[in-house]
Amino acid sequence: MKLTLRHAVPADVPTLRVLIDTSVRGLQAADYTPAPIEGALQSVYGVDSQLIADGTCYVVETGDASVVACGGWSKRKTLFGGDRWTAREDALLNPQQDAAKIRAFFVHPNWVRRGIGSMILEACEKAAAAAGFTRLEMGATLTGVPFYSAKGYVVLESIEALLKNGESLAVVRMEKRNGSG
């Protein structure tokens, strides 16, 4: 099946909301219990409109125009979190000293292990390099750590994101030198 990578646009937001919910519920249950998943869906996980406005969010769609994955990179300080996440820092980064942020990767459970996440990650890494960034950083879910490790990212630290429902979500801060694999 033909897959197309393109920049996300504001009209994609309703579709992305459904994709994110489906991806999280379908893929993260092995790594998180229901309470943190629900809390994260109400606060951390979600569409980041700033990524779309900045032109740094991508979607992959099938031949019938169904969006099956999304992900992006950011030139802003926010490490993770959608529009509802209160710990956002939208100040711009300095490419000479800061790491670009890899952000908001979600793949539909029926479309995993087909190279789609790799396709988006490669586009993000190339775009960040073109913008002058030599390092990349992310807040990965426990579910995503094996994928990112295989792509050359190394673990820096574990973070507990406090959620509105009183739960916490384990997030792993990872980094890579851009162009290193």
Where are the regions that the model predicts?
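Conserved N-terminal entry element of GNAT/NAT acetyltransferase domains
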Residues: M1-P14, G179-G181
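Hydrophobic pocket/interface hotspot
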Residues: L16, D48
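Conserved GNAT-fold acetyl-CoA-binding loop/helix
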Residues: D21-G46
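Conserved acyl-donor/pantetheine-binding loop and adjacent beta-alpha core of acyl/acetyltransferases
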Residues: D54, S66-V112, E122, A127, ...
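Cytosolic beta-strand hydrophobic patch enriched in CBS
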Residues: C57-T62
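C-terminal "cap" of GNAT-fold acetyltransferases
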Residues: T134, M138-V145, K151, E157, ...
